[in-house]
């Protein structure tokens, strides 16, 4: 059987996103690396931080990639036949494919988020739209001087 793994991008964070993997030994080095980057235990951060803090680009991206890497490590798979990532999920995909270690993927993810924030300034933002047809969406984009970039 051929295995494929798709690593999601920065999406909705859930406070229980590590519940299935947090007690497994495979997650410990990944969570430790995330702790070093976030300056806080990821599990404690998810439990106590306010929503704005969790949605900060760097925090959200590091948590998202940590979750993916922990999940893959918990499965104990030796690299799927095919691995792909969407947006920041590419960072996890490259690690899972063997390009770099999970800790390096997290460091690069943090740096990626910092560079994105520096390039963006205060005028930008990212949005998610569901449930509108193309015409409705285009009218909203035009009315608010927005564009689809992904």
Give the location of each predicted region.
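A structure-centric signal for secondary-structure junctions around beta-strands
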Residues: 1-2, 123
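Helix-rich "cap/lid" substructures immediately adjacent to catalytic or cofactor-binding pockets
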Residues: 2-84
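Broad structural signal for hydrophobic residues in well-ordered alpha-helices, predominantly aliphatic
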Residues: 34, 75, 93, 140-141
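Basic, gly/Ser/Thr/Pro-rich low-complexity segments located predominantly at protein N termini
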Residues: 14-16, 44, 90, 94, ...
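A broad detector of short, well-ordered amphipathic alpha-helices
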Residues: 32-33, 66-70, 90, 103, ...
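Alpha/beta catalytic cores of group-transfer enzymes, especially the acyltransferase/condensing modules
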Residues: 10-11, 38, 96-150
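Gly/Ala-rich beta-loop-alpha elbow adjacent to hydrolase catalytic centers
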Residues: 68, 81-89, 93, 101
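Alpha-helix C-terminal capping segments
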Residues: 73-76, 94-100
């Amino acid at each position: 059987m051929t295995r494929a793994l798709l690593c999601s991008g920065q999406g909705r964070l859930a406070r229980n996103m590590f519940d299935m993997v947090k007690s497994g030994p495979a997650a410990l080095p990944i969570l430790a690396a995330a702790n070093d980057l976030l300056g806080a235990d990821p599990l404690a951060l998810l439990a106590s931080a306010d929503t704005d803090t969790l949605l900060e680009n760097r925090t959200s991206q590091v948590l998202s990639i940590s979750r993916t890497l922990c999940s893959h490590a918990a499965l104990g798979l030796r690299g799927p036949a095919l691995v792909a990532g969407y947006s920041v999920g590419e960072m996890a995909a490259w690690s899972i494919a063997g390009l770099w270690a999970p800790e390096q993927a997290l460091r690069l993810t943090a740096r990626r988020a910092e560079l994105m924030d520096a390039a963006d300034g205060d005028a930008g933002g990212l949005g998610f739209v569901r449930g509108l047809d193309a015409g409705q969406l285009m009218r909203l984009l035009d009315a608010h001087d927005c564009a689809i970039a992904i």
